[in-house]
Amino acid sequence: MKVADFSKNASPAGVPVRGFMLDVSRGRVPTMDAFAELIDLLARLCYNQLQLYIEHTYAFENHGEVWQDASPLTAEELRALDKLCRERDIEFVPNLNSFGHVERWLKHEKYKPLAECPDGFYHAIFKMQRVAGTFAACEETADFMSRLYDEFLPNFSSKKFNIGGDEPWELGQGRSRELCEKCGKRNVYLEHMARLKKRVEKHGKKMMFWGDVLLGESGEIPAEFLKNTIPVIWGYDSGHPFDAQCSRVRAALEKAGGNGEFYLAPGTSSWLSFGTRQTNALKNIREACSAAKKYGASGVLLTTWGDFGYHNPFCANLIPLVVASAEMQGAKVPETAKEFAGIFEELGIFDEAEAFAEALLNFGKLDDCISKKITNRSITREMFFAKGEAFESVMSGVPADEIAAAQDGISEIEKILLRVPAAARNALSFKELMLAVKMAHAALRRAEAFLKNDASARAAVEAEMAGTLKTEFAAVWRLSNREGGLAESLSWF
């Protein structure tokens, strides 16, 4: 199978905008060479939009304390990436979270007056006290973001701008408590998003935003707010109610004027994982693309994130990227190692890629060996990083025979990787996959030692995790990423 087959066999009912969003704020900021390779990969796979998720990893003037340890992108670099994307017919859409997920700003004393809860808040989902992470919903913070927009947006030729706006966890717990009690949290949220929208439109751009708050309450979606915006309906688990949410958004857009745009955003399921949640990813992608075509979405934005240390290798995105491209275009979706190998060879990832493709497919299904699931993350990854009572909680209810089955799976993957030609073993994707397999294997050996109450074996594997695996992780990181964020990622080991 070749990539050309996607467009050649594409359905006329395919999705017009085929986008990919890469998180560059949770640790990993790729080198410019790695960005260039990504853009080339996306172009070859028929993607036509790229977004880089940014919270603090842009070198804003006068805000050096926020990004000084992050190896941030510069204006010159963003302009170079914009040019590179235009040359490959890819729209480079600016993405800067502007309401929630701003912990890396608000942890500094200088910015705490902008916070909804300057001293932190109680997170109902994580059931713990968290540091401030959401701007207050007021003119002051909208003006602050406007000044950042003035500096950030001239680097992009796109007429769209994704301001994020997802998960403002503590909204209504601090400065806006009385207003939310009086007017309702969603109304306070929409009022502030309208403030930001005015600042976006000043730059001649259309505001994109995550739709979770909009869809979080039942009832009719305020149609007027959606005018000249692009809501993005995101959901990363198979079985996400895309149909119901698309129906609500489509109805609101028709009420607002009929020709409104909206996107759907599935995920690669690579985050909080070593690459072992592929089964969930492919179902999620298929369901999102199906709903996008059914309800006339203008785009699908495949996302990948780096929550809690960004330990997921980029190679874990390869199969989801290929499958999503085919699904978006309504083309035949590759399924076998041989089919993926043909595509990987064409993309220049490997010359002889069948063994690599087989190993990547098998590794992606590793978590299927264990019946216990943890929402939005890999249980194998949790077996590696969880400590103390958290590790005991992860292991609760996990039977020894399932750990053994997963270890058998790892052993088979290791045998397959031995078939990868020697000339291909210097490829970054091979090194990433080898490391991911080693880390998953260590996690399973740690789990086995716990179940056997073998303190000596557990101590040995934990020493390996904190020693050779940590060292190898840093070495592989540096092959394609900047130094910023690495120390934070290593602190999890």
Spell out what each predicted region is.
Residues 1-183, 188-191, 195-203, 208, ...:
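Feature activates predominantly on carbohydrate-active enzymes
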